[in-house]
């Protein structure tokens, strides 16, 4: 397990993984710059790949897919991913409801239905891990995209979100900020307003129609066509989704219960009494903001949802692989804040993905190179 010694200038971290890797000593400057995260990511990458190298069936080393930060993807893969997402927006819905029209909408419907069971509980991390994997399969099966699946390291863009290669409105982005709206408020308390607020005006998703939601509508699943809105918010990003925020989440949480609660801003204290504020989960979501990006239930309709959640999964992947033998665990029940009360979750419990994909056990999503069915790792940026 991790042991931490912190001074004003230096954070010393010493740990051994199942493969004997040692975590270096980091200065605060290394944490703030992202150098610490790069090193931690490399340790996790090597640890996971070593497991895959020992496999003789399932997820063998030659089958492992490498997930990359958006800016490290080739231009061909950026365009291919973006075009495949647009392709899903042309495929028919499987739900047979009046509101959702497309297979892309179905992801919003599934997230809407599952929200009370996959947030602030035992399945938060692993359900969303598999949710992204299901999307990856649909992009391949229905739209022919077999390239890199992206993650978005929020901290690389805090302070200049408009210029992020993910949101700069270029042909290889996921569209732009929304048009600026005067006198609007931030979508989350404790932050300054963002720099947009209106409809996305440039890039591949400028003409995207959001078909369902919002949560507060009388019938959230009724057909309600409107534009995609964004309100990129650097203040949120700096406060809750920075490289320091992400790195300290990994370093100062020695149990999965604290890790998942800290990521979701539940007010827990980590190792040494460390606090995490609103948490990187909300920090990433509200760095994008807008509609449906700020909608707890329907945020999966925002194209940026998936690179955002891939980055959160990457942090979990790193955290797990820093002490793999001890970190194949879950904590909590099967309902949000245990309301209504439910038993503690166990690894054999099922997580729901129908009709998009068959349901799987929590255990099946535990290891990204476990091969049942996952087989991927995260490359440091």
Name each region found by the language model.
Residues 1-25:
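Fungal secretory targeting signals
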Residues 21-381:
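C-terminal accessory segments of proteins
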């Amino acid at each position: 397990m991790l042991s931490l010694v912190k001074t004003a200038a230096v954070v010393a971290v010493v740990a051994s993984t199942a493969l004997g890797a040692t975590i270096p000593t980091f200065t605060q400057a290394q944490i703030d710059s992202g150098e610490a995260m790069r090193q931690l990511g490399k340790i996790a990458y090597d640890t996971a790949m070593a497991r895959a190298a020992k496999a003789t069936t399932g997820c063998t080393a030659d089958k492992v897919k490498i997930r990359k930060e958006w800016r490290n993807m080739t231009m061909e893969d950026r365009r291919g991913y973006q075009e495949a997402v647009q392709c899903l927006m042309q495929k028919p819905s499987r739900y047979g409801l009046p509101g959702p029209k497309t297979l892309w909408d179905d992801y919003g419907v599934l997230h809407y239905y599952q929200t009370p069971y996959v947030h602030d509980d035992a399945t938060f991390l692993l359900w969303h891990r598999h949710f992204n994997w299901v999307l990856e399969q649909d992009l391949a099966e229905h739209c022919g995209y077999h390239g890199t699946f992206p993650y978005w390291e929020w901290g690389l863009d805090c302070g200049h979100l408009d210029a992020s290669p993910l949101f700069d409105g270029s042909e290889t982005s996921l569209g732009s900020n929304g048009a600026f709206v005067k006198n609007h408020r931030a979508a989350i308390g404790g932050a300054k307003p963002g720099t947009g607020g209106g409809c996305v005006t440039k890039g591949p998703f400028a003409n995207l129609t959001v078909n369902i939601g919002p949560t507060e509508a009388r019938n959230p699943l009724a057909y309600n066509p409107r534009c995609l809105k964004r309100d990129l918010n650097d203040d949120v990003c700096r406060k809750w989704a920075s490289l320091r925020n992400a790195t300290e989440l990994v370093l100062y949480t020695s149990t999965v219960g604290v890790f998942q609660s800290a990521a979701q801003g539940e007010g827990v204290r980590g190792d040494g009494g460390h606090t995490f504020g609103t948490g990187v989960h909300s920090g990433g979501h509200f760095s994008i903001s807008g509609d449906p990006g700020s909608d707890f239930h329907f945020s999966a309709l925002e194209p940026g949802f998936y690179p955002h959640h891939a980055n959160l999964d990457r942090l979990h992947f790193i955290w797990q692989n820093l002490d793999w033998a001890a970190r194949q665990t879950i904590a909590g029940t099967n309902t949000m804040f245990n309301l209504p009360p439910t038993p503690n979750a166990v690894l054999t419990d099922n997580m729901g993905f129908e009709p998009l994909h068959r349901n799987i056990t929590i255990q099946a999503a535990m290891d990204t190179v476990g091969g049942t069915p996952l087989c991927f790792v995260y490359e440091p940026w």
